[in-house]
Amino acid sequence: MLLAPPSTPSRGRTPSAVERLEADKAKYVKTHQVIARRQEPALRGSPGPLTPHPCNELGPPASPRTPRPVRRGSGRRLPRPDSLIFYRQKRDCKASVNKENAKGQGLVRRLFLGAPRDAAPSSPASTERPAASGGWAAPQDAPEAAGKRALCPTCSLPLSEKERFFNYCGLERALVEVLGAERFSPQSWGADASPQAGTSPPPGSGDASDWTSSDRGVDSPGGAGGGGGSEAAGSARDRRPPVSVVERNARVIQWLYGCQRARGPPRESEV
């Protein structure tokens, strides 16, 4: 029966690899300092206290010199490429932004101020006009402004079907000839136009009672003798406010609807 060594039952475990290396250290280590020193096991949670041991225990000339140049070189050389890249990117971005802003400002100037070539010939022309004509500069510009303000469709181009339909209120040509084309002219729609004796009021103008009263004043002997009735009617007509466009259009629509109902056959109520 084999007996176990006296150390094993007291410890109750097998020697670890560190202990075995410590026992055989004299075989592969030649320095007496390393043989006399016992290596402690590495602690995972605290790497700080382990770092100074190799630096202090190794040779004094080699330990301080080796880490310093590596740290200095790594601290100075690593940020250089990144900083250069960042600097170049910022510089390129600023240059591109400045170019785009310059292009945008030039475009805005061309849109709002116009091209310099177009503005150059206009300035001497404007300076030559008062020098040559003197006080007659305003009469020369007046016809151009008047032509731009008032564009007469009858003078420029012949009336199309839509324009004719709008001007004659959608009526047929035969009915317009019967009623009189002069009643549809723009002058007949004004409130200041005085009616002639024996004429019916145009559609959209004042009430028929005003026209009949003025006609009666003219035809009556008192009106023919002194003219007081016509003057009173004229003053009353002047005091009346002019007819608005909305009211005139409403009267025209009502008049057209009445004409359509008069021309068509009578309708029977379905109620």
From Swiss-Prot:
Region Disordered, annotated ranges: 1-83, 116-145, 186-245
Compositionally skewed regions (Gly residues) per UniProt: 220-231
One Pfam short name: FAM110_C
Segments of skewed composition (Basic residues): 68-78
Bias (Low complexity) ranges: 116-126
Range of residues in the leader sequence: none
InterPro entries, per database record: FAM110, FAM110_C, FAM110_N
Family: Belongs to the FAM110 family.
Protein name (Swiss-Prot/TrEMBL): Protein FAM110D
Organism: Homo sapiens (Human)
